[in-house]
């Protein structure tokens, strides 16, 4: 199982938002590539980059920072945040990003996902944000009647690379992940699933690592605040003999 550090970008800086609120921002690094190098040095093989300005505006907002992160980091990088246009996916892939994450558009325009999966095979990740098992869209503002597992199965049929599953009631709150909901989703699909939201301790990572077939877990606030030591977490996962 991969432990995947998150780098959230706003105004060219590495930040965290509390529960997705743009009014509650903590700046961790003025130069996001410094964060990328830190996590690489601590053993990360995959980075999760979110363009928060892009999520707000619906078009790429932090391309210079994304390029600098790509130059600094040797492993795989996935990027998301307001990606709703084919040209934005093309642009990100052209600067060396490995996989592109789409979110809200998967609910609003499933045909878009179908089309980009055909154009860019195994390059598309669908981010599914859910609250009480129901899909939330528009930066968590709106909860739909669509069940997360139903959406995941539909997207799997389109040929996505995998799914990032976020339990939004727990994200950035350090309350622990929703193990049951994550396990249910992993068991329902065949594509890789990456868990996100609420990971606050090495114990949380250990619990997630017990879910067979879970591909990875994203951690943000906990590694920046020091609640999780990334090196130690990676050592424990490997020491436990959990498959990566």
UniProtKB/Swiss-Prot annotation:
Molecular-function annotations in GO: 1-(5-phosphoribosyl)-5-[(5-phosphoribosylamino)methylideneamino]imidazole-4-carboxamide isomerase activity
GO biological process, one term: L-histidine biosynthetic process
GO cellular component: cytoplasm
Keyword Coiled coil: no
Annotated transmembrane regions: none
Protein localization: Cytoplasm
Taxon lineage: Bacteria, Pseudomonadati, Nitrospirota, Thermodesulfovibrionia, Thermodesulfovibrionales
Keyword Cell cycle: no
Positions of the catalytic residues: 8, 129
Entry's family note: Belongs to the HisA/HisF family.
Coiled-coil residues: none
NCBIfam families to which the protein is assigned, alphabetical: 1-(5-phosphoribosyl)-5-[(5-phosphoribosylamino)methylideneamino]imidazole-4-carboxamide isomerase, PRK13585.1
Keywords associated with the record: Amino-acid biosynthesis, Cytoplasm, Histidine biosynthesis, Isomerase
Reactions the enzyme catalyzes: 1-(5-phospho-beta-D-ribosyl)-5-[(5-phospho-beta-D-ribosylamino)methylideneamino]imidazole-4-carboxamide = 5-[(5-phospho-1-deoxy-D-ribulos-1-ylimino)methylamino]-1-(5-phospho-beta-D-ribosyl)imidazole-4-carboxamide
A Pfam family recorded for this sequence: His_biosynth
InterPro entries assigned to the protein according to its UniProt record, in alphabetical order: Aldolase_TIM, His_biosynth, HisA_bact_arch, Isoase_HisA-like, Isoase_HisA-like_bact, RibuloseP-bd_barrel
PANTHER family: 1-(5-PHOSPHORIBOSYL)-5-[(5-PHOSPHORIBOSYLAMINO)METHYLIDENEAMINO] IMIDAZOLE-4-CARBOXAMIDE ISOMERASE
EC identifiers of the protein: 5.3.1.16
Entry protein name: 1-(5-phosphoribosyl)-5-[(5-phosphoribosylamino)methylideneamino] imidazole-4-carboxamide isomerase
Metabolic or biological pathway: Amino-acid biosynthesis; L-histidine biosynthesis; L-histidine from 5-phospho-alpha-D-ribose 1-diphosphate: step 4/9
């Amino acid at each position: 199982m991969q432990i995947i550090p998150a780098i959230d970008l706003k105004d060219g800086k590495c930040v965290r938002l509390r529960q997705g609120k743009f009014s509650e921002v903590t700046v961790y690094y003025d130069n996001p590539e410094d964060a990328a190098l830190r996590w690489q040095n601590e053993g990360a093989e995959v980075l999760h980059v979110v363009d928060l300005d892009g999520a707000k505006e619906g078009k790429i907002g932090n391309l210079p920072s994304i390029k600098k992160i790509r130059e600094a980091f040797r492993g795989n990088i996935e990027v998301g945040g307001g990606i709703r246009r084919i040209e934005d996916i093309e642009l990100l892939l052209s600067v060396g990003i490995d996989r592109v994450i789409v979110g809200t558009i998967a609910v609003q325009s499933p045909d878009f996902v179908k089309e980009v999966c055909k154009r860019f095979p195994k390059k598309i990740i669908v981010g599914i944000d859910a609250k009480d098992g129901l899909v939330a869209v528009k930066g968590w503002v709106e909860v739909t009647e669509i069940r997360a597992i139903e959406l995941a199965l539909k997207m799997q049929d389109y040929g996505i690379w995998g799914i990032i599953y976020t339990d939004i009631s727990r994200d950035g709150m350090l309350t622990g992940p929703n193990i049951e909901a994550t396990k249910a989703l992993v068991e329902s699909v065949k594509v890789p699933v990456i868990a996100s939201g609420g990971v606050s301790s090495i114990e949380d990572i250990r619990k997630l690592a017990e879910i067979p077939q879970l591909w990875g877990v994203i951690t943000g606030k906990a590694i920046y605040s020091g609640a999780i030591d990334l090196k130690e977490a990676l050592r424990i996962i490997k020491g436990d003999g959990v498959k990566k």
